[in-house]
Regions:
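Conserved catalytic cores of very large enzyme subunits
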Residues: 1-210, 231, 235-393, 397, ...
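Glycine-centered flexibility motif
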Residues: 81-82, 217-220, 328-330, 406-410, ...
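Generic structural "secondary-structure junction" signal
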Residues: 141, 146, 218, 230, ...
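Contiguous, well-ordered alpha-helical segments that form the cores/surfaces of helical PPI scaffolds
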Residues: 214-227, 247, 407
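Long insertion/accessory domains within large nucleic-acid-processing enzymes
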Residues: 393-422
Length: 422
C-alpha cells in the first residue's frame, strides 16, 4: 500500500472559492473511505492507506459553522473505518510557533513525525512542505530504569550515557547522508519534491539549520516510571518524575542542536513491531518483573497503559501535557467500541480534541468473517499460550478467511501482527 498521508485542511485555501472547491474534494475523499475498498471476495473492507488527517478548525468544529457537514461525515467515517485522524488547528497554532512569533498548522510525515517550525532565511517565510527527516533512533526508557536498580542517581547517570549513545547513533545517520549528490534521486533533490538543487550538487546544506530534522525517539515511559516510583505516571505523585524524564530528553536535543546546527527533536516512537523485540530483550536481561516486563510489549511513547481504567476525555487531557513535550511528533489514541450508532458521542470527542490536544485519533473495530458474514468484532482468545483470532459467531480461526483491521501503534494494520502487538 502507498505510504501516504492525505491532509484535509480548509484553511490552507487561499480564497473562499478555493475553500469551497477543497471542501468538495474532502467530502468525496471521506465518502470513498467510508465505503471502503472491495476485496477479492467482493467485501467492502477497511484499507490501511492512505492515512487521512482532518483538521478541526473554527469553520467546521461546531454545529452551525459552514463546514459542519464535513465534520459530521468525518465522524461517521471514523466510526466505521478508524480514519480520519484529527489535528486541532487551535492547539497547533499555540504549539508550533516560528521565530517570527507566528503559529502554524501543518501535516505530519507518516503517522506522527512532525517537522519543527522553520522560516526560510532567503524569503523570511515559513516552509513545511518539501522538508524531511534524517532518521530516528529510539531510547528504551524501561531498560534505563531497570539498569539503575531504582537508584535515582544511577538512573540519571545511565540515562545520560544512553542518550549519548543515541546522539552518536544519530550523527552516524547524519554522516551517511552527507555527500549524497542530488543525482541520487532527482525527483527528490532536483525536481522539487524536497529541493531544487543543480545536478551534481551535494544535499549537505539541507541537513543543517532546521531545513530537515533528526529525531530522538523514546518508548516505555509508563514502565520506566512504574518501576522507579511504584506508581503509574497518571498518579499525581509519579507524574513530576515522568515530566522530568521528558524534559531531560528535550534538553539533550536542545544541547545537540546548539552543538551541531542540526535540528534534533524529541519523538514519541510508534514502536510498531519493535515493541515485541524490546519486551523480549528486557525479559532476557532482567527476567519477569510483574507489571514491568511480564508482557510481550512495552507501552508506546508516553501513553497511558492499556490496562489502566481511564475514560477517553481524561486520557486525552492527561496525555496532552506529554504531547507538548514531543515536538518531533506524537499522537494520542482512545479505544472505543463500535460507535456507528452513536455519532454524537464521536463528535463530542472531536470537539474535546479541538479544545485540548493537538493530535489524536479514535480506535474502533472494523472486521468481517468470510465464513459466516459476521461484521462485528473478531475476538482474540488465548489458546495454549498463543493468542488467536476467533469469529464469535461461527468459531472460524482461519486468518485467510477473515478481515481484521486494527491500529495498535500508529497505522491501521490488516495483515495480522506478531504476538506482542496482538
Amino acid at each position: 500500500a502507498p505510504f501516504i498521508t492525505v491532509f484535509m485542511y480548509l484553511n490552507e485555501a487561499r480564497n473562499e472559492q478555493e475553500k469551497k472547491d477543497l471542501a468538495m474534494i474532502i467530502e468525496e475523499t471521506l465518502r470513498q473511505r467510508y465505503e471502503g475498498v472491495k476485496n477479492e471476495k467482493g467485501v467492502w473492507i477497511t484499507p490501511a492507506f492512505p492515512k487521512l488527517i482532518y483538521v478541526l478548525e473554527e469553520d467546521n468544529v461546531r454545529e452551525g459553522t459552514p463546514y459542519w457537514y464535513l465534520t459530521r461525515l468525518a465522524a461517521q467515517c471514523t466510526a466505521k473505518r478508524m480514519v480520519p485522524d484529527y489535528i486541532s488547528e487551535k492547539k497547533m497554532l499555540e504549539l508550533k510557533v516560528d521565530k517570527n512569533g507566528e503559529g502554524h498548522c501543518y501535516t505530519c510525515m507518516g503517522c506522527r513525525s512532525f517537522l519543527t517550525p522553520y522560516v526560510d532565511p532567503e524569503t523570511n517565510k515559513p516552509k513545511y512542505y518539501g522538508r524531511f527527516n534524517q532518521g530516528v533512533i529510539t531510547i528504551n526508557l524501561v531498560d534505563v530504569a531497570l539498569s539503575s536498580g531504582r537508584d535515582y542517581d544511577k538512573f540519571w547517570k545511565i540515562f545520560d550515557e544512553r542518550l549519548e549513545l543515541c546522539h552518536q547513533g544519530l550523527l552516524c545517520r547524519h554522516e551517511r547522508l552527507k555527500g549524497t549528490l542530488s543525482d541520487a534521486a532527482p525527483i527528490l533533490w532536483q525536481y522539487g519534491a524536497l529541493a531544487r538543487l543543480p545536478k551534481g550538487e551535494p544535499i549537505d546544506k539541507l541537513l543543517y539549520g532546521g531545513y530537515s530534522t533528526i529525531s530522538l525517539g523514546y518508548a516505555g515511559l509508563y514502565e520506566c516510571v512504574k518501576y522507579m516510583t511504584g506508581k503509574s505516571h497518571t498518579d499525581e505523585e509519579a507524574k513530576p518524575f515522568a515530566l522530568k524524564v521528558m524534559q531531560h530528553m528535550n534538553d539533550a536535543c536542545k544541547g545537540w542542536k546548539a552543538m551541531h546546527n542540526i535540528d534534533f527533536s524529541l519523538y514519541g516512537t510508534p514502536l510498531e513491531s519493535t515493541t515485541y523485540k524490546f519486551a523480549k530483550c528486557l525479559q532476557n536481561r532482567f527476567g519477569m518483573i510483574p507489571g514491568i516486563t511480564d508482557k510481550s510489549y512495552i507501552t508506546n511513547s508516553y501513553h497511558v497503559h492499556v490496562s489502566e481504567p481511564i475514560d477517553a476525555f481524561t486520557k486525552l487531557q492527561f496525555e496532552s501535557e506529554f504531547q507538548q513535550l514531543s515536538p518531533g511528533g506524537a499522537i494520542s489514541y482512545v479505544e472505543v467500541p463500535n460507535m456507528q450508532q452513536n455519532i454524537d458521542a464521536v463528535l463530542e470527542l472531536m470537539q474535546f480534541i479541538y479544545d485540548n490536544i493537538m493530535y489524536a485519533e479514535l480506535n474502533t473495530k472494523s472486521d468481517y468473517c468470510q465464513c459466516c458474514g459476521y461484521d462485528g468484532e473478531i475476538e482474540i482468545r488465548e489458546d495454549d499460550g498463543k493468542l488467536v483470532w476467533v469469529c464469535p459467531n461461527c468459531g472460524n480461526t482461519d486468518q485467510a478467511k477473515m478481515n481484521v483491521a486494527r491500529r495498535t501503534c500508529g497505522y491501521i494494520g490488516t495483515q495480522y501482527w506478531n504476538q506482542g502487538r496482538t
